[in-house]
Design a protein with these regions (language model features):
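N-terminal start-of-chain detector that recognizes signal peptides
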Residues: 2-3, 46
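Acidic, His- and aromatic-enriched active-site or binding-groove loops in soluble protein domains
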Residues: 8-17
């Protein structure tokens, strides 16, 4: 972390999402646009997404080992976030994408993962339809 913060102004992750003022500038999300994910229909869709902003996300440490995999995942949303009770999350725990086991209480979302993430990368994507505006956030973990 020190090397990155001393030598870079920003860094992008390998997770999908929309940048907002609350995101860690060294873990910025992005949607890939390339030969595999570059269809015009998809592009038109993602440029109309909005960030799903949150106060904080745990764990702060995104590097996972045998001791902390699966992680204890918690997100605290801002009080003014509407329709958060309609949130859907998906994760690639166990190396297969599936709907996450979520619990939402008073704007705090927790995910109980069924399996550990497999080496290289674990990801979580959450979205909510906020009165016709699709809001999205993603998180990634580096897995040893």
């Amino acid at each position: 972390r020190d090397h990155i913060s001393k030598n870079f102004k920003i860094a992008f992750g390998q997770h999908s999402g929309i940048i907002d003022i609350n995101k860690n500038r060294f873990e910025l999300p992005r949607f890939p646009i390339n030969e595999k994910y570059g269809e015009i229909k998809r592009f038109k869709s993602i440029i109309n997404y909005y960030p799903l902003e949150y106060k904080n996300l745990e764990p702060e440490e995104k590097k996972l080992s045998k001791e902390n995999n699966p992680p204890k995942f918690k997100v605290n949303f801002f009080e003014n976030q509407k329709n958060i009770e309609n949130i859907n999350c998906y994760s690639n725990e166990g190396d297969k994408w599936m709907k996450s086991n979520i619990k939402l209480v008073d704007k705090e979302l927790t995910i109980k993962f069924r399996e550990p993430f497999l080496p290289r990368r674990g990801r979580v994507n959450c979205s909510v339809n906020d009165n016709g505006k699709w809001r999205w956030f993603g998180a990634q973990f580096i897995v040893d």
